[in-house]
Design a protein with these regions (language model features):
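Right-handed parallel beta-helix/beta-solenoid
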Residues: 76-82, 103-111, 128-136, 155-163, ...
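Beta-strand-rich solenoid/repeat architectures in extracellular/passenger domains
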Residues: 59-72, 82-100, 114-124, 138-151, ...
């Protein structure tokens, strides 16, 4: 049996709460094993510290997160926080109108798991990691991963920072910036030997840069078929930058 959860705003609690689609109010204590165990509460800017939402074994959990805060992130792990959203059987949809759909900062660890993952950030970045943040989207079991945004689809900056995007079919699109961007020693990996099709589109599809005093950054992409689309010229990734873009084919 599938379970579907959605996020609503609770005026009484002044926070966004996860509720079962079959109920009209916030889940009560003990009403759902998964919510009770996960203790999931969302604020208008990010999931609370230590949040973990996983599926009961053998069941699917559909998670829809809508974050209207224009100054915040859809889901964030910061200052050493470790967060996992979903399971390999989940259907994940995250829509954030703020700065970033999902973010990991200052050695925060954020993992988004799902059979299918859709992340939309029409006003900002789809994903962002910085200052040692570790961000993982999808797993080897993920069928399709879609990242759609106005700014960078994948953004990583500073040493010891990494972003990994997995899925058998991956589509990353930025309407106004780089599809994938790495700088100042950060590392990005998109796809794996299990990825069939990878599409990246943006002002520059892929940009990895090194400024004068920084270590080199890298972007590694791997798939059976790779499609890169450059929407228009981006001066940030023209001659003068030290770029390190690595392509792999299974």
């Amino acid at each position: 049996m599938n379970k579907t959860y959605r996020v609503i705003f609770s005026a009484a609690r002044g926070a966004l709460m996860v509720v079962n689609e079959l109920t009209s109010s916030v889940q009560k204590k003990g009403a759902s094993a998964i919510v009770t165990a996960a203790a999931l509460t969302l604020t208008s800017t990010a999931l609370m510290a230590g949040t973990t939402l996983v599926a009961d074994e053998g069941q699917n959990v559909d998670i829809n997160i809508e974050v209207p805060d224009k100054n915040g992130h859809g889901v964030e792990a910061n200052a050493g926080e470790i967060k996992t959203i979903g399971s390999e059987q989940s259907q994940i949809t995250i829509s954030a109108t703020g700065k970033t759909g999902i973010a990991a900062y200052s050695e925060g660890y954020l993992t988004i798991l799902g059979q299918n993952i859709t992340l939309s950030s029409p006003n900002g970045k789809a994903t962002q990691a910085a200052k040692g943040g570790q961000l993982t989207v999808g797993s080897e079991a993920t069928e399709k991963t879609i990242l759609s945004s106005k700014n960078e689809g994948v953004y990583a900056s500073k040493e010891n920072t990494s972003v990994k995007v997995n899925g058998k079919d991956i589509d990353i699109t930025s309407s106004k910036s780089d599809g994938v961007f790495a700088s100042s020693g950060a590392n990005v990996t998109v796809g794996s030997e299990n990825t069939s099709t990878l599409t990246i589109a943006g002002t520059t599809a892929i940009c990895a840069q090194q400024t004068l005093n920084d270590k080199p950054s890298s972007v590694n992409v791997q798939a059976d078929s790779i499609f890169l689309r450059k929407l228009f010229k981006n001066p940030r990734c023209q001659a003068g930058w030290n770029k390190n873009v690595l392509f792999g084919f299974s």
